[in-house]
């Protein structure tokens, strides 16, 4: 590993339909084995279902709100002090918030049995928009864990 400098962040161009960078990142997370066109079809049809089900005029704003509802604010990180390992609550960086929310939404959409990815993704986005479902439960569990370990907050980095 080179010690000179860290790699530069590359700018991601917006997606072709909505021009949104966040949606393009979401498509990249859905993509498997480099098949971006398949991922785009899945995401766009899921967004279409999502918009129709909730009667949204601007689907992108609805997607943003669903993503915002899924973002964690606090998480716990392991910190070794002496011989003991403590779960220390830490505020989540904004880039990581987006990343975790997207990962959780996609993970729970894939785990829905008997449904195609498009239907599962649309259902999970609707649930996030309405502040319910597996992704929101995961977020609440993460917050609950951080709250339970608040006593170790002074072990921050």
Curated annotation (Swiss-Prot):
A cellular component annotation (GO) from this entry: small ribosomal subunit
Keyword match Ribonucleoprotein: yes
Keywords linked to the UniProt accession: Ribonucleoprotein, Ribosomal protein, RNA-binding, rRNA-binding, tRNA-binding
GO biological process, one term: translation
InterPro entries cross-referenced by the UniProt entry: Ribosomal_uS7, Ribosomal_uS7_bac/org-type, Ribosomal_uS7_CS, Ribosomal_uS7_dom, Ribosomal_uS7_dom_sf
Cross-referenced PROSITE patterns: RIBOSOMAL_S7
Entry annotated with the keyword Repeat: no
Pfam families: Ribosomal_S7
Domain of life, source organism: Bacteria
Gene Ontology molecular functions: rRNA binding; structural constituent of ribosome; tRNA binding
Complex formation: Part of the 30S ribosomal subunit. Contacts proteins S9 and S11.
Family note: Belongs to the universal ribosomal protein uS7 family.
Function noted in UniProt: One of the primary rRNA binding proteins, it binds directly to 16S rRNA where it nucleates assembly of the head domain of the 30S subunit. Is located at the subunit interface close to the decoding center, probably blocks exit of the E-site tRNA.
NCBIfam families: rpsG_bact (TIGR01029)
Name under which the protein is recorded: Small ribosomal subunit protein uS7
Provenance organism: Chlamydia pneumoniae
């Amino acid at each position: 590993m080179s010690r000179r400098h860290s790699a530069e962040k590359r700018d991601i161009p917006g997606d072709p339909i909505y021009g949104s960078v966040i949606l393009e990142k979401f498509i990249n997370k859905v993509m498997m084995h480099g098949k971006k066109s398949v991922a785009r079809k899945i995401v766009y049809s899921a967004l279409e279902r999502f918009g129709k089900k909730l009667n949204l005029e601007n689907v992108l704003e609805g997607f943003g709100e669903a993503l915002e509802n899924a973002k964690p604010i606090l998480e716990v990180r392991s910190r070794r002090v002496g011989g003991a390992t403590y779960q220390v609550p830490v505020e989540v960086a904004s880039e990581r918030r987006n990343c975790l929310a997207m990962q959780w939404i996609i993970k729970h959409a894939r785990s829905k049995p008997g449904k195609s990815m498009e239907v599962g993704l649309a259902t999970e986005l609707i649930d996030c928009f309405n502040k319910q479902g597996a992704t929101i439960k995961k977020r609440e569990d993460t917050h609950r864990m951080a709250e339970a370990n608040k006593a170790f907050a002074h072990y921050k980095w």
